[in-house]
Amino acid sequence: ITPDMDWQRFFRFKALLDRYQVKPLIGVVPDNRDENLRGSSESRKDAPADFYAYIRGLQEEGWSVALHGMNHVYSTKKGGLFPLNDFSEYAGKPYEEQKEMIARGKQILEEHDVHTDLFMAPAHSYDRNTLRALKENGFQALTDGFGEQPYLWQGLTFYPISFRLSDTLKKKKGYSTMVVHTGTIQENELAGYE
């Protein structure tokens, strides 16, 4: 989520989560430069006056927060280790650049007293340099993994994501991270989640 996103859609989805007492993991983009994540001025009118105070409040309610990149801008045409997309904010960039981007994103969150050791890669794309940079910056886990259970690899815990939500919801066992882009969610999708 971002300070400049479509808050009306977010609050509608949050009401659904609250109704069913779901405490989600959310990805926070500390310096959003992705126009696709920005809501209209009308949809931002209900935005919290202090974005980071709001995020801290969600954490106090039991929500988990992940660093969701730095700017959420796809500047490479690399998919990295997770073959879902062929573009990335991180994959394909030199280690030092990735390390600096991750450090800066974490610093922005911590300057606002938001602390996390979870990472959510924009476009689910990362490479070995990303993993190394995450560990160097104190991260313990990321959301973009395979399978049905969290697992340890390269010194990090990976939480599996759902490739096809309908298939994931039919499973009788296992764990998965559902990806919901609340800023662009449509009415029929809201009804489906209900």
Q: PLM ranges: what are they?
A:
Residues 1-4, 66, 70, 84-86, ...:
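Active-site groove signature of glycoside hydrolases
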Residues 1, 29-31, 70-72, 146-147, ...:
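Active-site beta-loop-alpha junctions enriched in small/polar residues
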Residues 1-64, 108, 115, 191:
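Active-site beta->alpha N-cap acidic-glycine motif
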Residues 89-164, 187, 191:
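Catalytic domains of cell-wall/extracellular-matrix polysaccharide-remodeling enzymes
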Residues 1-5, 37-46, 87-96, 179-185:
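The substrate-binding groove and active-site-proximal loops of carbohydrate-active enzymes
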Residues 73-85:
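Short, flexible, mixed-charge acidic loops at enzyme active sites
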Residues 24-26, 65-68, 116-119, 141-144, ...:
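Hydrophobic faces of well-ordered beta-strands that scaffold small-molecule active sites
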